[in-house]
Amino acid sequence: MTRPFTAADFTERMTRAAAQASAAGLSGVLVTPGADLLYLAGYSPISITERITMLAIHASRPPAMIVPALERPGAEPAPVALRDWADGDDAYAAAAELLDPDGAYAISDSAWAMHVLGLQRALPESRYVSMTDALPTLRAVKDAEELERMAAAGAAADAVFEEIATSRFSGRTEAEIAADLARLLIAHGHERAEFTIVASGPNGANPHHEESDRVVQEGDMVVLDFGGTKDGYGSDTTRTVHIGEPTEEEAEVYDVVRLAQQAAFDAVRPGAACQDVDRAARGVIAGAGYGERFIHRTGHGIGLTVHEPPYMIEGETRPIEPGMCFSIEPGIYLPGRFGVRIEDIVAATADGGRRLNDTSRDLRIVS
C-alpha cells in the first residue's frame, strides 16, 4: 500500500524547485493549475477556469498562492500562504503582490495566455520562461514513492491485457472491446480509464484511431493501446494481437517492431541522450525497409500526466537520468492494410532501464 504524500513532501519539492530556479538565474517559479500544482503543493482546483490561481515559489521567502475567494476552502490544506481575491477585484494586481516587479520566472507550460498577459500588464518589467525548459528534471525524475506508484500502475495495465487477451475478439466491434478495456482498467485498480484505442485491420495503420463500429474479423491484426490513472500516476501500454494465424508478411512486420522495441530498451542508460533511444528503434525499422512507415517519436515521458517530458525523439539531447519514466513504443503503419505497435513504460535506473510492463512482447494469437 503506497503512503499518501504529505505536507513535508510538498515542502521539499517546492524547496527543490526554488533552488533549481535560482541555479538557472531566475527569481522563482509560478505554478498554475494542473499537474505542476498537484506535484508541488498537492492542490488541484475543482475546475480550471478563467479565474487565476497561481502559486509563487521563491528561494528568499515562503511560498504563497493566489486563489479565487470562492475556492479558498479547497486550497486551505496546501502547505502555502494564501492570498484570495474576489470577483470584481483586480486579480492580476493581487497576483503581482506575490512577485518581484522585475522578476524572471519559470511558469507552468500549461498557464493560460490570458493570465501571462495579465501579469505582464501588471508588471511590465517581469519576464517568463517555460518551466519545462528552465527546470527540466523537476517532475521528469521520479522519487522512490513515485516509482512505486508507476510500477503499480504498470502491473495493473498488464493485468488488463492478460484478461482481455483471453476474451473473444472476432465478431465484436472495436467499440465493444474498448468498453471492456475501460471496465477492466477500473476493475484492476485504476481510478480512471484515460484512453482506449482498439484499431483493427486497416484501422491499425492510424496510430490514434478512435474505436468504431467496425467488426473485428478473422485475419485482422488488432492494436490495443490503453491506460489509466492509478494512485495519481499513469499507465500506458500497447500490445498488438492477431485474430488467427498471421501471414508471413504480418509476422515479419511484427518481428521488426519487436526487435526495434528491444533495441530502444537496450539504449536506455544514464547519460545517453533521449534521441539515442529514438535512433536505436528507428535504425532497426529503417534497416528492414519500413523507415517511412514509422511516423511518430519512439516515446514520451509519463507520470502525473500520460504525456510529459522527456520525449524520445530526434533532436532531444537531454540526458537520461535515473528515475525518469517514459514509453518505448515503435510502430510500423501500412495504410489501408494494418499496423503494429508495441509499448512498454520504462524507468531509467543507475545501470540501464527497468520495464514497468512485463507481458510478453511476442505476437499473441487470439480468437
Each PLM stretch: what is its role?
Residues M1-S367:
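Active-site neighborhoods and metal-handling regions in enzymes and metal-associated proteins
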